[in-house]
Amino acid sequence: MALLSLSSCYNGNSNGNATSANPSFDEVITSRRSVRKYDASKKISEAEVRDLIKAVQDAPSWANQQPTKYYVAISPEKLAAVQDMVGGNKERIKDAPVLIVSTYERGKSGFFQGEQSNEVGDGWGAYDNGLSNCYLVLKARAMGFDTLIMGMRDADKLRELFSIPENETVMAVISLGYRAEEPNRPERKNLDEIVKFF
């Protein structure tokens, strides 16, 4: 995986979140939310983002291809530019101190010696990207941060802004920051609606 770092910022670790210093995995899962309002007074350092992405490198991928790449907006100029590329989410993430563009390199996962391994093809790249992003949002929560994965984004403008190669698919923009309020927990489906035992 690659980390594109654009600038450094505040190094503080104080977050005021409800998570403990060493939350259990269950605590991380149950406290993670898609956060749509961030605390503008709290910043995240480049070093903290690097620690986050380093942990994400342990995510599984097809034949260890590691197709996911990250482009990190952390400078005021790049943050403002990306905010204009996320459609209706602009107002929701205007106070997030970090915005991360997630991509995957096509022709890696789902391929062997350049040939598509099964009918899913490059869908495996998207699958592996989702696994990496799952690691990202869970590790972020373990670090006391909050996230929002946004599928609404202008891929062409993001590609130009970050000089993203043409062989990478722009999947999502992920905001990273501290929640300004406690979000509600959406209702989940009944377990029997999503699993069958045989």
Where are the regions that the model predicts?
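Acidic, surface-exposed loops and disordered segments
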Residues: L4-F198
